[in-house]
């Protein structure tokens, strides 16, 4: 395939008997036509206590995937991935990345420029160093609450797959709002300690929490289905 293709992020609630097999064996490119990559994780509520039902929601599943084109997504949802059609997903084009993952090796650092005022989707994916998990939680939970409570984040959540994989997913009203949050500047007068994210990133540079860590930025194309009883998470300015 030439070019980055189309990405999706799916959210669905299923019985544990369905989610556990998907966590162990997500959809595979050799079994799903025009699928390039897929990863399934259990949802977590950002900022939830470490030991709590909200921290590991085995019935609520996220899937991050890369496809050849939108026709491949439709074929998957109409066929082998029909259970995902009962949930919610957003279709996205890749804009840029910071760092890289072995699972997504050939993406360019920047595919397209973005407008500061356009809506944006951010996905992080990391493989944890297990001895660093307590330290990661100490620095990470304040950032989780910052993103969760930010007035410009229309949807924000985290997901995990034992033992090492962790992801965050967020939709923002604008690129500017997201980058201001990342750097702890501007537009956050109503939030306590807006520099939490910048401080955590400085700590990660001092001693990394992860074997691998990458941040991806996407332009939302279209939104499908319902999550938690609602739709419309992608701001209307995205020209949906």
Give the location of each predicted region.
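Outer-membrane beta-barrel domain signature
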Residues: 84, 190-192, 196, 203
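Conserved CoA-thioester-binding segment of acyl-CoA-metabolizing enzymes
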Residues: 81
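Active-site pocket scaffolds in enzymes
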Residues: 200-204, 211-212
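Alpha-helical membrane segments in multi-pass integral membrane proteins
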Residues: 159, 167-169
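Short S/T/G/P-rich N-terminal loop/turn motif that feeds into the first structured element of a domain
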Residues: 1-61, 68-76, 85-162, 177-191, ...
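Acidic/histidine-enriched, beta-strand-rich ligand/metal-binding domains
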Residues: 162, 197-200
């Amino acid at each position: 395939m030439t070019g980055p293709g189309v990405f999706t992020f799916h959210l669905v609630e299923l019985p544990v008997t369905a989610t556990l097999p998907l966590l162990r064996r997500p959809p595979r490119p050799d079994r799903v036509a025009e699928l390039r990559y897929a990863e399934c994780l259990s949802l977590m509520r950002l900022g939830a206590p470490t030991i709590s039902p909200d921290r590991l929601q085995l019935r609520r599943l996220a899937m991050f995937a890369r496809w050849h084109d939108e026709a491949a997504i439709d074929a998957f949802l109409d066929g082998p991935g029909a259970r995902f059609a009962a949930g919610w997903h957003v279709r996205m084009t890749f804009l840029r990345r910071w760092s890289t993952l072995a699972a997504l090796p050939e993406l360019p650092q920047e595919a397209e420029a973005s407008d500061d005022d356009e809506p944006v989707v951010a996905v992080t994916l990391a493989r944890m160093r297990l001895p660093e998990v307590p330290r990661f939680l100490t620095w990470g939970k304040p950032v989780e609450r910052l993103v969760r409570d930010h007035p410009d984040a229309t949807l924000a959540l985290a997901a995990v797959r034992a033992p090492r994989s962790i992801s965050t997913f967020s939709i923002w009203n604008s690129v500017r709002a997201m980058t201001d949050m990342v750097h702890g500047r501007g537009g956050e007068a109503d939030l306590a300690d807006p520099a939490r994210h910048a401080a955590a990133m400085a700590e990660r540079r001092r001693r990394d929490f992860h074997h691998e860590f990458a941040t991806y930025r996407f332009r939302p194309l279209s939104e499908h289905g319902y999550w938690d009883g609602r739709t419309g998470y992608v701001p209307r300015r995205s020209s949906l």
